[in-house]
UniProtKB/Swiss-Prot annotation:
It is a multi-pass membrane protein. GO terms for cellular component: plasma membrane. It comes from Haloferax volcanii (strain ATCC 29605 / DSM 3757 / JCM 8879 / NBRC 14742 / NCIMB 2012 / VKM B-1768 / DS2). This is Protein-export membrane protein SecD. Keywords: Cell membrane, Membrane, Protein transport, Translocation, Transmembrane, Transmembrane helix, Transport. It is found in: Cell membrane. Coiled coil: none annotated.
Amino acid sequence: MSTLRDNWRVIFLVAAILLSTFALFSPTMGNQSPIGEDDSATNLQFGLQLDGGTRIRAPLVGVTAEDVEFEGDSERVVERQVAAQIAGADAADIIVRTGAESSTVEATIENVTADDLSAALDAAGYAHGEVRDGVTGTTRAETVRVLQSKINEAGLSGGTVQQVTTATGEHFILVEVPNRDQSDVVDLVGERGTVQIDIYYPTGTDNGSRTYETREAVLTQADFTSIGTAQESQTGSGAFVPVSVRDDPAAEFQTAIQDTGLAQPGGTRCTYMEDGGRNTTEGCLLLVVNGEVVNAFGMSGGLADTMRAGEWAGAPSFQLQTRNTSEAQEIAINLRAGALPARLDLSGEDSGTSSYISPSQGESFKFDSLITGIVAVLAVAGVVFIRYGKPQVALPMIVTGLSEVYILLGFAAAIGYPLDLSVIAGFIAVIGTGVDDLIIIADEVMGEGSVKSRKVFQSRFRRAFWVIGAAAATTIIAMSPLAVLSLGDLQGFAIFTILGVIVGVLVTRPAYGDILRLLLTEDR
């Protein structure tokens, strides 16, 4: 028991290595790979620099008015009033935010200018302060959340979304998706992802022709409480997404179906999508995605009966019909992730860019990174052996230093952090600073002659550890701004350099001290 108590730091190091091994290789820790992708031998995820993929860096479309006075109107009323004054806008393109200190109105429709929003607010009767290009920080944060959710729902392993800020104060959204074509990623994140249900119904005749009206947004994304997975239809072509509706909107939807006459005995047959069908069809439910009708469908007799009887709202569920499985999958993703509050400006006019790294180039970067790491380890090993010439000092130093990197790899696998070139640079920095600290320990312990007594060893080790602790604190303080600020690749470098320093001070340096004590002292 005394041996275990005296060497608990070494045991702690071994436990950390075992946990890292579990995180790296356990099937229970790995993310589900999309169908058709090869499974990796480890649970490590790689960024697009090492796996190939697409990077998108773009600002958000929109302008913002500060210090708006709403004159007691609700947010919904303000959105409708302002949207009515901007050509081509609807309430979904206007974001109203109220705060204790300031209230803002954002217009996120394309090609809108600060002058357009200012004129719209004036016409609607709302006093306001400065009107500027760009959106609020809250909108940027919500956009990051929705985009990350979209990427996760689409099964794009290793995809990341973050805000980045330039030195001049410009704000961008940075999207990185490894191992995916540029067109696929742009299609996923380029649209706002709005999904709504409209009712298209006949209202009478005019000169022998039917007349129609559209009741828009009878159901929107916020009205759905459960979204199933996209499924192929068993009765014919097409696909569908099973959904459930919240109680309050379900009652309103049922009333709208009754009022528009869509719930006919025996159901309705919709020919909206056929040539000339818009002028002859019976009532239809329109599935509208990003402002475009992607499908139209009638109502089955059974569903129509429950609507007419007022029973459907008690168990409000139905199927969103689509023409194919890919449409159904897109709709399911948009419903789960939510709509983007503002679109990414991918036009390139405001520095919006997208780039693609081929998988073969990513594999080349992986190989080069591996070679660089091996060269760094061999260089450190050579210097250590030349300096000491004692295997009992040098070998534990190298093994302990490498275990630090292994623990960091396990941590990256556990949290699913995608490795890129900046993180690899952080690992190499950890090897250098880690072995440097171990050399300080060895020099302090052995610099005043041989050490046989455990008491003398502990005294010298404590002096060395104070130096190491001060150096670690300095590194953490220096790197913290890079880790906190959204500075792209520098953030990954800083995070793993700081983690390496922390692991070194808490785990590997104390363990190396215990190993040296066991090998050098006689009263162990």
